[in-house]
């Protein structure tokens, strides 16, 4: 929101302000999801390829399985945390 001045927002009608704010919130959410995916992928890649030299442009079957399992565990954990937080809010 730092790139949109308060004066510019104030000059818009209420509907346009709401649309812009919803768009900004949506983009922020997308950015957070992309950052999480990047962080999980980076962490899992390092875990699954520790002390292994990269010898080709593709993963072998054990590396691929390790990455899949690692990412799935973190996604499952995130889902459980979100569900627990949603349950706590009720």
Swiss-Prot record:
Localization: Mitochondrion inner membrane
Keywords: Chaperone, Disulfide bond, Membrane, Metal-binding, Mitochondrion, Mitochondrion inner membrane, Protein transport, Translocation, Transport, Zinc
Disulfide-linked positions: 44-70, 48-66
Taxonomic superkingdom: Eukaryota
Function: Mitochondrial intermembrane chaperone that participates in the import and insertion of some multi-pass transmembrane proteins into the mitochondrial inner membrane. Also required for the transfer of beta-barrel precursors from the TOM complex to the sorting and assembly machinery (SAM complex) of the outer membrane. Acts as a chaperone-like protein that protects the hydrophobic precursors from aggregation and guide them through the mitochondrial intermembrane space.
Domain comment (free text): The twin CX3C motif contains 4 conserved Cys residues that form 2 disulfide bonds in the mitochondrial intermembrane space. However, during the transit of TIM8 from cytoplasm into mitochondrion, the Cys residues probably coordinate zinc, thereby preventing folding and allowing its transfer across mitochondrial outer membrane.
Assembly mode: Heterohexamer; composed of 3 copies of TIM8 and 3 copies of TIM13, named soluble 70 kDa complex. Associates with the TIM22 complex, whose core is composed of TIM22 and TIM54. Interacts with the transmembrane regions of multi-pass transmembrane proteins in transit.
Name the UniProt record assigns to this protein: Mitochondrial import inner membrane translocase subunit TIM8
Organism listed in the record: Debaryomyces hansenii (strain ATCC 36239 / CBS 767 / BCRC 21394 / JCM 1990 / NBRC 0083 / IGC 2968)
């Amino acid at each position: 929101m730092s790139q949109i001045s308060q004066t510019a927002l104030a000059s818009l009608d209420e509907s346009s302000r709401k649309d812009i704010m919803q768009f900004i919130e949506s983009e922020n959410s997308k950015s957070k999801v992309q950052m999480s995916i990047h962080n999980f992928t980076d962490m899992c890649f390092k875990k699954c390829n520790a002390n292994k030299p990269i010898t080709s442009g593709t993963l072998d079957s054990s590396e691929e399985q390790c990455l899949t399992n690692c990412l799935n565990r973190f996604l499952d954990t995130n889902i459980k945390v979100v569900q627990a937080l949603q349950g706590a809010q009720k």
